[in-house]
Amino acid sequence: MARYIGPKCKLSRREGTDLFLKSGVRALESKCNIEAAPGIHGQRRGRQSDYGTQLREKQKVRRIYGVLERQFRGYYQAAASKKGATGENLLQLLECRLDNVVYRMGFGSTRSESRQLVSHKAISVNGKTVNIPSYQVRPGDVVAVREKSSNQLRIVQALELCAQRGRVEWVDVDSAKKSGVFKNVPARGDLSADINENLIVELYSK
């Protein structure tokens, strides 16, 4: 499956919630009617079956983290093989992706932009360049913007935006040095309550 490159607003409207695919400079509601599904019949949201509800939740999470279907299934299988709650394991694996950590640290204004920074070799982990967005960051890893990329305007603007909205507690960032430490894997209670990972587990358990 190819990566979606169309309007980000359309994806948020499809899921009926803000997927944080935009930078957040303006409120999403000012430019995107997320209460209505995309298309000419968007005002009509029909009743969903249990399967439909489970599928929509899976699509929502997959789109939030920018993961393709095959990758997402792989994450689920890895989560199911680990000890603990499969749904929580799944979210933690997604949170440990390098592109997501770059976003959480504020070096990219969106996960999509953060993924591009990683792919373009603008990011290092423990002093070594890593250009794999799916790279799993571990507690204690130092993630930084490489010196040759540190003056990019989009990175400077992303850090300013992050300072306004605040950072998550599981990263410690020195904005001046454009470097941060991934302190720990977030617990389920630290992550979005708007995600019902149990629906995803039910979907893949069929």
Swiss-Prot record:
SMART domains: Ribosomal_S4, S4. GO terms for molecular function: rRNA binding; structural constituent of ribosome. One of the primary rRNA binding proteins, it binds directly to 16S rRNA where it nucleates assembly of the body of the 30S subunit. With S5 and S12 plays an important role in translational accuracy. It comes from the Bacteria. GO terms for cellular component: small ribosomal subunit. This is Small ribosomal subunit protein uS4. Keywords: Ribonucleoprotein, Ribosomal protein, RNA-binding, rRNA-binding. SUPFAM superfamilies: Alpha-L RNA-binding motif. Belongs to the universal ribosomal protein uS4 family. Residues 96-156 form the S4 RNA-binding domain. It comes from Pseudomonas putida (strain W619). It holds the Pfam family Ribosomal_S4. GO terms for biological process: ribosomal small subunit biogenesis; translation. Part of the 30S ribosomal subunit. Contacts protein S5. The interaction surface between S4 and S5 is involved in control of translational fidelity. The lineage of its organism: Bacteria, Pseudomonadati, Pseudomonadota, Gammaproteobacteria, Pseudomonadales.
